Amino acid sequence: MKNTSALAETAALWAAVRFTADGLVPVIAQQHDSGEVLMMAWMNREALEETLVTGKACYWSRSRGRLWRKGESSGQTQKVLALRLDCDGDTILLLVDQTGVACHTGRRSCFFNEVGPTGEITVVSAPLVTPEALYGAEGHSHP
């Protein structure tokens, strides 16, 4: 999904996206060919613009207060093949080609905790790689 900066400046897009009072919009990343839901993150206008221009997922890290270019420290990138808005314009769906794992815990998906009928939580997927292997000896805090 490589786009020109002209697309990022499209008035229709900015009118359609409903950012929160904090200037953010929730984003779901989904593997384009399998339908697997990989993660949920946030974008601000700058992150959305960068994603559109580069074709690579860029999010807003609320904990760090800065842009988070997916894979910049781990190499686990997301190539954006399509971007969709929901019917209200308040959630974005990215159809991506995920390189490696999406979760900072080393799992393919961030959705690895399954909640049972009585509220018990079962971990349904093991890490494919350690956070230390992804981010170095210091590990990684949640984006």
Swiss-Prot record:
Pfam families: PRA-CH. Its main location: cytoplasm. One of its GO terms (molecular function) is magnesium ion binding. GO terms for biological process: L-histidine biosynthetic process. Mg(2+) binds at D86, D88, D90. Keywords: Amino-acid biosynthesis, Cytoplasm, Histidine biosynthesis, Hydrolase, Magnesium, Metal-binding, Zinc. InterPro entries: PRA-CH (IPR026660), PRib_AMP_CycHydrolase_dom (IPR002496), PRib_AMP_CycHydrolase_sf (IPR038019). Catalyzes the hydrolysis of the adenine ring of phosphoribosyl-AMP. Homodimer. Belongs to the PRA-CH family. HAMAP family: HisI. This is Phosphoribosyl-AMP cyclohydrolase. The gene is hisI.
